[in-house]
Structures are given as C-alpha cells and as structure tokens.
Swiss-Prot record:
Belongs to the FlgI family. It comes from Rhizobium leguminosarum bv. trifolii (strain WSM2304). Its main location: periplasm. It comes from the Bacteria. One of its GO terms (biological process) is bacterial-type flagellum-dependent cell motility. It is found in: Periplasm; Bacterial flagellum basal body. Assembles around the rod to form the L-ring and probably protects the motor/basal body from shearing forces during rotation. Keywords: Bacterial flagellum, Periplasm, Signal. The basal body constitutes a major portion of the flagellar organelle and consists of four rings (L,P,S, and M) mounted on a central rod. NCBIfam families: PRK05303.1. This is Flagellar P-ring protein. Residues 1-26 form the signal peptide.
Length: 373
C-alpha cells in the first residue's frame, strides 16, 4: 500500500507585477461559430421504452418488476395474451430514451437517440429498441424511436471473473427517431433577431453589433444591431429585408472575439486547461514530493512436529520513505508559454501542477480566473 503526501512550498513571491503587457494575438471567427439564434434553440425529448434481444444481460423481473409489467402491456397491445405465464428470461431491459429536437426540424427527418438502462441489466449490447414515443415538456409526442442500440463498452463474465470496459448500460440509436410533429416556429414573422453568445463577453458583443451595423449601413442605409448585454445582441429587421437571407449574411460576418482569462482544473481527472490570455506575475515556486511506502509481509510460524503448538502469523512491516523534487523554478514572463515552461522545469505531474496553480492564485500572481470542476 502506498500513501502519498505532497506538499507545496512557495519560496518567494516577487511583489512587482509586469506592467506593459503586449496584447494577445487576435482571434477571428464567424458569428455563426460564436453565437446562436434565440429562436433556433434545441428542445429536449424523453420517453420510456424496452430493449429486446439481449443475451441474458437484461433486467431480472424480481429486481425490476416494472420491466415485466411493461412487457406484458406491450404484448397485450399487440393482441398477445399473457395470462398465466411467467418468464424468467433476461433478454429484455427497460430504458429511458432521450433526444434533442433540433430547431426547424420537419416531419419525416431523423434524429439520434440515447438509451439508458433503468433496471439491473448488465449490458444493452446486441439489443433492439422497440417503438417508443418521445414527448416534449408540453406532453405532446414529437418523435417515435426504434432501432438497434449501439453500445461502445463490452463485458465478459465467467464463474470467477468479470471483465468490463466502458459503459455497457447506455448506448445510442443513430437516426433511430423519426420526427412526427414540428415545433411551432414564428421565425418568418419575427421583427427582431436575437443572437446569444455561447461565451458571454461585453467586448465580443459590442464588436458583433459594430460589424452588423457596418454591414447594415452599407446594405440598408442604417444601423440595425444593439448589444443588450454581454450575451445578447438584438438585430431589428429592415423593412425590405428577407429574414432568412438577412440571417445567412449576418452569420458569415467575421468578428474578433475576446474571452476572459481562465484556468480550468478538473481535480478528479487531473485535466488542466490554460487559456492563451493568462498572465503570471514573476514568482518563484518550489515543489517537492514525499512518498511513504508501507509493505506488510506477514510470516507464518509452524510448530515443531508432534508438538501441541498451533500455527501462528507474525506480522512484519517495512516502511520506506523517499523525497523527490524540491527544485526552485522562477516563473518570470507574461505569456502562456512561459508559465508552461516554468512548470515543466520543476518536473511535476498534473496533480502537482494543480497544487502549484492554486498556490500561485492564492499568492495573487495568477492574473486569471481559476475554475475548479
């Protein structure tokens, strides 16, 4: 058994921050890539269904009685009597079926659906989803799903061992749902177009409004866009404009984007994402790792032959401690490359980098928002 004790020591924090920092390189994007139309949002659909054809990996009727009830109801709807019969076959599983209904979807088009086990099924691999209606938040049925479930994980089981890779109790049915009802849309009758930024930012919203007004002034003779806040830009429809063509022209306009500096840390997976606008004031960091390994090797002591002694177990414990690292690295530079190079010079793993970044933020030397997930 290994116990890891990691400590972080900030040796010194230089008080002077970097003054004249050069602006970050500009990133340009199309409006369609950074904003979405408010009237064109997705809608969520949900349904309850059955997956059949499983090879003994479905729900047990004792642990999941709702699966048996659903199967009996389905067979009765098909005109098959289920009186007096009881099945112990585990080839059926109850699942929740979810999907996203895209905007402006028309009847007859197909969408992907996700199936997730509700009972004690161990795998949905090889199963087929039978006809399942998908409803929206208003209770109306908008699509019907059916098809073979695709499961990426697998499971192999024997009498004494089980091997599982990935998730076997959830999967997808590509193109498994047919849209039967379209959402009521008033896009053509709209007076205003509302663009919503995927990453809210006042600077980007103002730039979008300026770019759209420049296009509208040249095309229609006046400005039409106004930045409402950091997330929404409202565009008034010109009288002579066709709304579909207007949106097609606007979404292809190029705008310079800007986002706040962030460092995103996922402590569970050790993932660290550092934005290009992150700035670090000069700071010196030392990081060390203390590893303590405890090994138990019990010894079995046998009694002498023909004696009345008993076999005994004598514990034996070996403890070894090792300390690595401890070097001091000075991070002195305004850009992301300097920060990454300084952390790599210390030679630490991702969990150590997480601790260092938290320490730098606490010292006031990290000029960015630290987001912990």
């Amino acid at each position: 058994m290994k116990l890891f004790f990691r400590f972080l020591t900030l040796v010194a924090v230089l008080a002077m921050s970097l003054a004249d920092v050069a602006p970050a390189w500009a990133l340009t994007s199309r409006i369609k890539d950074i904003a979405s139309l408010q009237a064109g949002r997705d809608n969520q659909l949900i349904g309850y269904g059955l997956i059949v054809g499983l090879q003994g990996t479905g729900d047990g009727f004792r642990a999941s009685p709702f699966t048996e009830q659903s199967m009996r109801a389905m067979l009765q709807n098909l005109g098959i009597s289920t009186q007096g019969g009881q099945s112990n076959a585990k080839n059926t599983a109850a699942v929740m079926v979810t999907a996203n209904l895209p905007p402006f979807a028309s009847p007859g088009s197909r969408i992907d659906v996700t199936v997730s086990s509700l009972g004690d099924a161990t795998s949905l691999r090889g199963g087929t989803l039978v006809m399942t209606s998908l409803s929206g938040a208003d209770g109306q049925i908008y699509a019907v799903a059916q098809g073979a479930a695709i499961v990426t994980g697998f499971q192999a089981q024997g009498q004494a061992a089980t091997v599982t890779e990935g998730v076997t109790t959830a999967g997808r049915v590509p193109g498994g749902a047919i849209i039967e009802r379209e959402l009521p849309s008033r896009f053509k009758d709209s007076v205003n177009l509302v663009l919503q930024l995927r990453n809210p930012d006042f600077s980007t919203a103002i730039r979008i409004a300026d770019i759209v007004n420049g296009y509208a002034s040249a095309r229609f003779g006046g400005p039409v866009a106004e930045a409402k806040d950091s997330q929404e830009v409202v565009i008034q429809k010109p009288r002579t404009a066709d709304l579909t063509r207007l949106m097609a022209d606007i979404e292809n306009l190029i705008v310079e984007t800007d986002t706040p500096a962030k460092v995103v840390i996922n402590e569970r997976t050790g993932t660290i994402v550092i934005g290009s606008d992150v700035r670090v004031s000069p700071v010196a960091v030392s990081y060390g790792t203390l590893t303590v390994q405890v090994t138990e090797t019990p010894q079995i002591i046998q009694p002498e032959p023909f004696s009345q002694g008993r076999t005994a177990v004598q514990p034996q414990t070996d403890i070894a401690a090792e300390q690595t690292g401890g070097r001091v690295a000075i991070i002195d530079g305004p850009d992301l490359r300097t920060l990454v190079a300084g952390l790599n010079n210390i030679g630490v793993k991702p969990d150590g980098i997480i601790a260092i970044l938290q320490g730098i933020k606490s010292a006031g030397a990290l000029q960015a928002e630290l987001v912990l997930q």
